[in-house]
């Protein structure tokens, strides 16, 4: 349970009451809807830290969070209580944000399942009754579509079960999907014909090709990579010059990266021995930023 800390006398008096366990217990017992109340073992009401709240939400919430165990004792329930003396149109979304933050904090504590978080709003403003829906889905421009999206499983693109023939029809996504589906295979030479067919379509630009082949190189070994890209170049002569240029550039970048990493290693050894930083930079030709990054 959390209580607002905005600086009004309404908030202050509400907080002064609801910070006490017995008062909080009575509030939940009286006002939580009966079906939800039956889930809670209010004898286990416990004050929890809520330092996990992000800066945007800190202006609305105090450092009080109450949890209760379920009647079956197999899980936790959090009750979020918010006080308002003025109605807020997007209040349900704000409470949802806090609820999700509480769920994440619960997982960060080592639990493996999401807890139930029950938001409640205590209102005593001038406008009566409360004028806005407290279902956050009603706050979308298209509530009906929002209900379809957030009340069912999210779309999944599991490329591992998509047939290669179908992937080949996926236009500008096809080459990426094909490579990522099969990237864990020891030998990618079996994909050469399909890759050549996709290169001919011109759906992949040079930057994407370089990124893709660099990905293949990073996840395999150099010897197999050379055979792989060489075979593609032979099967796609119109792309051969471009592919070999990319391969050469990747090899050069790999060599440069290796030299840079070796320089960083030497610099660290020199610094560990107490040598002057200026001398280290002169010997290794590293920049001050390189040394700062290395120290972290």
UniProtKB/Swiss-Prot annotation:
InterPro entries xrefs: Rpn/YhgA-like_nuclease (IPR051699), RpnA (IPR010106), Transposase_31 (IPR006842)
Record's keyword terms, sorted: DNA recombination, Endonuclease, Hydrolase, Magnesium, Nuclease
Pfam families xref list: Transposase_31
EC number: 3.1.21.-
Phenotype of the disrupted gene, per the record: A quadruple rpnA-rpnB-rpnC-rpnD deletion shows no change in basal RecA-independent recombination.
GO MF annotation terms: double-stranded DNA endonuclease activity
Domain of life: Bacteria
NCBIfam families xrefs: T_den_put_tspse
Role according to the record: A low activity DNA endonuclease yielding 3'-hydroxyl ends. Upon expression enhances RecA-independent DNA recombination 19-fold, concomitantly reducing viability by 98% and inducing DNA damage as measured by induction of the SOS repair response.
Family from the record: Belongs to the Rpn/YhgA-like nuclease family.
Protein name: Recombination-promoting nuclease RpnB
Gene: rpnB
């Amino acid at each position: 349970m959390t209580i607002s800390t905005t600086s009004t006398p309404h908030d202050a008096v509400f907080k002064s009451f609801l910070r006490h366990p017995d008062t909080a217990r009575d509030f939940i017992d009286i006002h939580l809807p009966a079906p939800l109340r039956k889930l809670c073992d209010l004898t286990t009401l416990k004050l929890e830290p809520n330092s996990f709240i992000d800066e945007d939400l800190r202006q609305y919430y105090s450092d009080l969070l109450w949890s209760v165990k379920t009647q079956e004792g197999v899980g936790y329930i959090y009750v979020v209580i918010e006080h308002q003396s003025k109605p807020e149109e997007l209040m349900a979304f704000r409470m949802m944000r806090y609820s999700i933050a509480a769920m994440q904090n619960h997982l960060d504590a080592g639990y493996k399942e999401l807890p139930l978080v029950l938001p409640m709003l205590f209102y005593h403003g001038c406008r009566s009754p409360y004028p806005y829906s407290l279902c956050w889905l009603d706050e979308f421009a298209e509530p009906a579509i929002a209900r379809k999206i957030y009340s069912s499983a999210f779309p999944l693109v599991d490329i591992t079960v998509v047939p290669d023939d179908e992937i080949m029809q996926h236009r500008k996504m096809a080459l990426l999907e094909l490579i990522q589906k099969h990237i864990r295979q020891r030998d990618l030479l079996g994909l050469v014909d399909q890759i050549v067919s996709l290169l001919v379509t011109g759906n992949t630009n040079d930057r994407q090709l370089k990124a893709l082949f660099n990905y293949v190189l990073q996840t395999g070994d150099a010897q197999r990579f050379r055979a792989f890209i060489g075979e593609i170049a032979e099967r796609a002569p119109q792309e051969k010059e471009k592919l070999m240029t990319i391969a050469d550039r990747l090899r050069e970048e790999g060599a440069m990266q290796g030299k840079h990493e070796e320089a960083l290693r030497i610099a660290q050894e020199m610094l560990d021995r107490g040598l002057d930083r200026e001398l280290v930079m002169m010997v290794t030709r590293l920049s001050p930023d390189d040394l700062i990054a290395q120290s972290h």
